């Protein structure tokens, strides 16, 4: 009897071990099926809070293997089936406890009842949207299943939902039976019958409850069978066919090759769960994805925020394009504009913010405008001040009936560009003579604070408006807000504001705004050139800040820096801007760009890249400004490639070179004059110094925009009058006129008039002096 009890105890242990192994395989099998997208339609298996388990794994009779159902499932429905085949199509009720919050209300099919339907396929033929779980991820800390991806439209017919059928279960079942048979062969038939007799159903339930293993929730589940399924040797069609139930009776199951490819890539990508080193809050991610599923195709949600860089997640196949404009409605009813810079994986677009990201949070709705940033254009923008996205910043309402144009455009093609090289007359003597500007050219303006740069810019704006009927656009790129405010009010006082539009992206704004504000201003200028057929003057202050902002954006996007820390795409970005500044058959855009040279290093990549595009260089000198001569342009350091006899003419070229030669000789004599005095010079050098002083003074000019400061009327001098005036000085026709008569005049005629008037006054005064003395004596 004792031996018999030991035998039974040993057999019980063997049976428990076999049961335990069977349960492990069963649970692993079920988890893999759910992970691949199967819905468990067989109610024999239920999903608990932390594991998948089965009810009454086996019965006493090994040949009558089946899984028992919970009694309440079959109450008042049917008798307990005798075989697996009779209840394989039963649809169990939804398990609310493992679904995310509000999931059932939003996504559950409305025609599925809460109780099971038995063998009634005809009642489920109605079509409806039924999200099917594409993938199940397991979080180690939370111990629950989470559903991170849902298909958008899947038919509700049971034929289209893959189920765990008898043949899917057959492999595990056969393995268990073979182990049970091996166990049975250890004893005689009588002992086996005794074992069956002694093992009651209650005992089996007790064994199951004690030995059923807990599901190990790991951060990464490795399945050899799954690895085998997605190996490179297997084709995606074979894998997709393997997902079809072996005993599928309905012939409506059709293999879609494109869908098979997508599922193969998805299985291959998501075959392992996120590792511990890169945990994600899967539940929060699931909420974002659920929200995405309810949004329209042109909307996404904020996924990640770090500084001015914002990641936006979109629904699958709804990704925006590079440079697309995205809009975010902030809680304060304001609008934030993002520009798409990169397209990351997992349907994420990395964007650069055009404003402050304060107030943003994950899950906030984002609208894809499906267009680049749009800038206001047309006559409505004149006299107004805007930011990078075209919003007015002058405390005035948005202009009515304003047009919009994208800031990203291709430069004019070769056949659209003008082939003529035409000099752009500014009416400023020193520029037109020594540094002639070309229509559609780029001019670099070098000068520090307080040397008259703003006044020169205003005078150019005035002269192009009055002399050519042209317009001006001013782009403040990364400079001080104070300077922009001063410029705005000075333009109002100077009377040129109505011929100008101003666009500002100052240094306190994010790098995205500073990088794109020049394109916004250029877009406005292009509209006037093409639609109004006008000559436009585009001012960019400062072009160095444009390169600097691009460097910041490049670092934020994670690009590898190039020389001196600048972005590797510096030349490309500069070319995108500069190539659009040109002359076409309709009109021209002439750009004057202030250039800051860091540490006076002309080899710095930012200024050196700019120099390659410049046609002229205008240098403002503080020494000349200290002499009270304005505009304080240094005639020796400034240069232009337009100063060529084939372009400006032989006479213009000779006069300009003679002026530069005299000024250069005068510069060389400065040291001798400072040491020995001017009296020690030769007669020829004295004549050179005299003419140089007159030329230096004659390069000055009264400006229209400075009339209220200088109390002198502004002068616009044509190029021909400028050439003739300097020619007379060089030829010695004005040697008898003192140098003070050349200061702040227009043409050479004004010099003669002032001199004659002064002489006549002197004669009158000299003739009156003796008469007065005689009267006194008398």
Swiss-Prot record:
Q: Where found in the cell?
A: Cell membrane
A GO cellular component annotation in the UniProt record: plasma membrane
Q: Where is this region: Unknown?
A: 1-289
Keywords per UniProt: ATP synthesis, ATP-binding, Cell membrane, CF(1), Hydrogen ion transport, Ion transport, Membrane, Nucleotide-binding, Translocase, Transport
Q: Is the keyword Cell membrane assigned to this protein?
A: yes
Q: What does this protein do?
A: Produces ATP from ADP in the presence of a proton gradient across the membrane. The catalytic sites are hosted primarily by the beta subunits.
Q: What is this protein called?
A: ATP synthase subunit beta
Organism name? Malacoplasma penetrans (strain HF-2) (Mycoplasma penetrans)
């Amino acid at each position: 009897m004792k031996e018999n009890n030991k035998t039974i105890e040993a057999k019980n242990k063997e049976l428990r071990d076999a049961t335990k192994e069977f349960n492990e395989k069963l649970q692993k099998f079920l988890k893999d099926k759910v992970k691949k997208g199967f819905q468990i339609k067989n109610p024999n298996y239920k999903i608990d809070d932390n594991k998948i388990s089965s009810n009454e794994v086996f019965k006493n009779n090994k040949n009558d293997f089946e899984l028992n159902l919970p009694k309440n499932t079959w109450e008042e429905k049917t008798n307990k089936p005798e075989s697996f085949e009779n209840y394989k199509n039963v649809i169990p009720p939804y398990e609310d406890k493992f679904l995310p919050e509000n999931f059932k209300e939003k996504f559950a099919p409305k025609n599925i009842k809460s109780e099971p339907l038995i063998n009634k396929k005809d009642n489920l033929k109605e079509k409806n949207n039924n999200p099917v779980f594409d993938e199940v991820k397991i979080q180690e800390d939370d111990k629950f299943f989470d559903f991170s991806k849902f298909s958008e439209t899947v038919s509700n017919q049971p034929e289209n939902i893959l189920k765990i059928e008898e043949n899917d279960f057959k492999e595990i079942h056969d393995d268990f039976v073979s182990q049970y048979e091996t166990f049975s062969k250890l004893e005689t038939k009588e002992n086996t019958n005794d074992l069956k007799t002694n093992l009651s159903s209650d005992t089996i339930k007790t064994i199951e409850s004690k030995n059923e293993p807990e599901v190990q929730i790991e951060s990464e589940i490795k399945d050899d069978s799954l690895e085998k399924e997605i190996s490179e040797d297997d084709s995606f069609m074979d894998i997709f066919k393997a997902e079809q139930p072996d005993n599928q009776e309905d012939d409506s199951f059709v293999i879609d090759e494109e869908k098979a490819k997508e599922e193969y890539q998805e299985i291959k990508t998501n075959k392992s769960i996120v590792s511990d080193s890169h945990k994600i809050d899967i539940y929060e991610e699931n909420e974002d994805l659920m929200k995405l599923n309810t949004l329209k195709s042109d909307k996404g949600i904020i996924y990640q925020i770090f500084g001015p860089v914002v990641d936006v997640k979109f629904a699958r196949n709804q990704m925006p394009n590079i440079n697309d404009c995205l809009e975010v409605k902030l809680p304060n009813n304001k609008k934030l504009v993002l520009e798409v810079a990169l397209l990351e994986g997992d349907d994420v677009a990395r964007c650069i913010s055009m404003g402050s990201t304060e107030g943003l949070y994950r899950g906030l709705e984002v609208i894809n405008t499906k267009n680049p940033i749009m800038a206001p254009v047309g006559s409505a923008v004149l006299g107004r001040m805007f930011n990078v996205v075209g919003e007015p910043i002058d405390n005035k309402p948005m202009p009515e009936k304003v047009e919009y144009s994208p800031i990203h455009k291709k430069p004019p093609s070769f056949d659209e560009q003008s082939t003529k090289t035409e000099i752009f007359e500014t009416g400023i003597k020193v520029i037109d003579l020594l540094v002639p500007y070309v229509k559609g050219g780029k001019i670099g303006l070098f000068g520090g604070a307080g040397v008259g740069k703003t006044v020169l810019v205003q005078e150019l704006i005035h002269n192009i408006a009055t002399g050519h009927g042209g317009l001006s656009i001013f782009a403040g790129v990364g400079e001080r807000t104070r300077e922009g405010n001063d410029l705005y009010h000075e333009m109002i006082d100077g009377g040129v504001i109505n011929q100008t539009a101003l666009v500002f992206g100052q240094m306190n704004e994010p790098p995205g705004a500073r990088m794109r504000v020049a394109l916004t201003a250029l877009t406005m200028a292009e509209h006037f050139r093409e639609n109004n057929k006008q000559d436009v003057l585009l001012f960019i202050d400062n072009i160095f800040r444009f390169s600097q902002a691009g460097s910041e954006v490049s670092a934020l996007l994670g690009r590898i820096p190039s020389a001196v820390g600048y972005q590797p795409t510096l030349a490309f970005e500069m070319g995108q801007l500069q190539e659009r500044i040109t002359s076409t058959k309709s009109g021209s855009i002439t750009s004057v760009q202030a250039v800051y040279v860091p540490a006076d290093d002309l080899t710095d990549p930012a200024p050196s890249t700019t120099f390659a595009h410049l046609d002229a260089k205008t240098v403002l000198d503080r020494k000349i400004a200290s002499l009270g001569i304005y505009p304080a342009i240094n005639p020796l350091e400034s240069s232009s490639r337009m100063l060529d006899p084939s372009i400006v003419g032989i006479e213009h070229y000779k006069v300009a070179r003679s002026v530069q030669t005299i000024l250069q000789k005068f510069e060389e004599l400065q040291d001798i004059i400072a040491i020995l005095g001017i009296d020690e010079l030769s007669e020829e050098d004295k004549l050179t110094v005299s003419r140089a002083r007159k030329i230096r003074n004659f390069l000055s000019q009264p400006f229209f925009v400075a009339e209220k400061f200088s109390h002198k009327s502004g002068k616009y001098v044509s190029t021909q009058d400028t050439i003739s005036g300097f020619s007379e000085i060089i030829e010695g026709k004005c040697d008898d006129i003192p140098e003070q008569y050349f200061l702040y005049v227009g043409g050479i005629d004004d010099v003669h008039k002032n001199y004659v008037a002064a002489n006549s006054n002197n004669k009158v005064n000299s003739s009156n002096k003796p008469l007065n003395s005689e009267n006194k004596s008398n």
